[in-house]
Design a protein with these regions (language model features):
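Acidic Gly/Asp/Thr-rich repetitive segments characteristic of extracellular carbohydrate-active
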Residues: 35-89
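Extracellular beta-strand-rich solenoid/capping regions of secreted or surface-exposed proteins
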Residues: 73-85, 97-111, 121-139, 145-162, ...
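Right-handed parallel beta-helix
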Residues: 109, 114, 134-145, 160-173, ...
Length: 477
């Protein structure tokens, strides 16, 4: 009897330690954890986001603040993302949210489910969006920043965070990079469109039409489209931004079209080589491309970024990349590199510490998948539809208004500005649990009891709310 009591106390103590020893951020999910959603892949695929938390409805496109309190108004996206606690954000409205200032996502344990918006979905415009928290899932949104407020910035930036996955989003019209994600751990950017950064706009340095800076540790970038950028398609981790994240990075099954002066480059690190896999990507030159067979330009020297440290070139594993118009580079990817010394060549694919992709395709297969299914594709707007056509045809439609040409633009007005998004009508959700009444009725749930969204009636791995959210877009992988 005494032995049984002692064992019980030991077990209770162990359980209390497991519960009470965590920090402020959500713990890193273990490899046996459930996928963030079916189709999630790569380093961030076990992100839990807002699973099991409260549901927050976005009911207005306004970004105004309450005049008496100075706080974001109820029902706004800003109010939803600035709340604390585990939560899932759903949308009862569609259209363009014109931000009045930079939007910071400073509290994690968050899922933003853009696929719930009725009509044509959501576009976020006017200012940068910056993720300053960990354990975040972002899906099916458009980030089209623009130049109307004369600010420098990325449409979306995520730096030095953990457990994040960004899926099926569209980014464009930034005045710096379209989307920069570096220094992150357990991270995925997948099935996104990154297009038409503004080349000669408001950036203090002048020409700055860049795709993105990407990197991290156990970081995956797959099935994305980069199109119509002058450079950084992408750039792998600046050496000075984070000297703790040296990879490995998986850059797999991406499509790059119409790069201008530079395609993919970078990779250098402080005192240690960064580890980068470039596998089965599809490169297609366009009218603005100056070096049509350049696959990658590994950085081996940098006068402004060593900061007193020894600069070490990145170690690249190149395999299966397809260079449109060049059989030589397609057959031997190193023929598309500006540097071919052993200093930049990995002897084998980097795998240690990396969550391997389960959805790898050949470059040619990925080309079709990305163009048909990536981006904010539940309801593609005219911008993404046009760009897909340009990639397929190897053409461009617009020049810039400040001297940029051949698909590289300088302002959203060069392409006709922001399209009007159909508002649609949100389905009735009586108990405000994020699941429409009609869907709850069809699945044997109670449309008058909000608690049933948090439980696992329909699937042992996903809450009932997640089953609904996942089902909306299950055909887009």
């Amino acid at each position: 009897m005494t032995m049984s009591i002692n064992r019980a106390y030991i077990l209770l103590f162990a359980l209390l330690c497991l519960v009470g020893c965590g920090g402020g951020e959500a713990p890193t999910p273990q490899p046996t954890a459930v996928l963030a959603f079916p189709g999630a892949d790569g380093g961030g695929k076990y992100t839990t986001g807002g699973r099991g938390g409260v549901v927050v409805h976005v009911t207005t496109l306004s970004d105004e603040r309450d005049k008496s309190t100075g706080q974001p108004i109820q029902g706004s996206l800003r109010k939803a993302v600035q709340m604390e606690g585990t939560r899932t954000v759903v949308f009862d409205v569609s259209g363009t949210i014109n931000l009045n200032s930079q939007l910071d996502i400073a509290s994690g344990n968050l899922t933003i489910a853009g696929q719930t918006a009725p009509g044509d979905g959501i576009c976020i415009a006017g200012y940068p969006v910056v993720v300053k928290a960990s354990n975040v899932i972002i899906r099916f949104l458009r980030f089209r920043m623009g130049d109307q407020n004369k600010v420098e910035g990325d449409a979306l930036s995520i730096n030095d965070r953990k457990n994040i996955i960004v899926d099926h989003c569209s980014f464009s019209w930034s005045t710096d990079e379209c989307v920069s994600c570096y220094g992150n751990t357990d991270f995925t950017l997948q099935y996104c469109f990154i297009t038409e950064s503004l080349r000669k706009s408001v950036h203090v340095k002048g020409n700055h039409g860049y795709g993105g800076i990407w990197g991290g540790t156990n970081a995956s970038f797959h099935h994305n489209l980069l199109a119509h950028h002058d450079s950084r398609n992408p750039r792998f981790d600046h050496s000075y931004v984070n000297n703790k994240c040296f990879g490995p990075v998986d850059y797999v099954n991406n499509v790059v079209y119409n790069w201008g002066g530079n395609s993919t480059y970078g990779g250098e690190g402080y005192d240690q080589a960064r580890k980068i896999n470039m596998i089965n990507n599809y490169y297609k030159y366009g009218p603005a491309t100056s070096k049509k067979t350049r696959l990658v330009d590994p950085t081996v020297s940098c006068s402004y970024c060593s900061d007193g440290h020894t600069l070490i070139p990145g170690k690249f594993w190149l395999a299966g990349n397809y260079m449109y118009g060049s059989t030589d580079v397609t057959n031997d990817n190193w023929k598309g590199s500006t540097v071919t010394t052993d200093a930049v060549k990995a002897s084998a694919r980097w795998t240690e510490g990396l969550t391997m992709l389960s959805s790898e395709q050949t470059a040619e297969q990925a080309y079709e998948t990305v163009l048909s299914k990536a981006g904010c594709s539940l309801s593609r707007d005219v911008i993404d539809t046009r760009i897909v056509g340009e990639v397929r045809e190897g053409k461009y439609t617009y020049n810039g208004s400040n001297g940029s040409t051949k698909g590289l633009i300088d302002s959203p007005s060069d392409v006709g500005g922001y399209p009007t998004l159909n508002a649609g009508t949100a389905p009735t959700d009586t108990d405000r649990d994020g699941m429409p009444d009609e869907w709850e009725d069809a699945n044997g749930l109670d449309k008058y009891a909000s608690a049933d969204g948090k439980i696992y009636t329909l699937d042992k791995n996903y809450t009932n709310l997640e089953v609904y959210l996942n089902g909306l877009v299950q055909n887009l992988f």
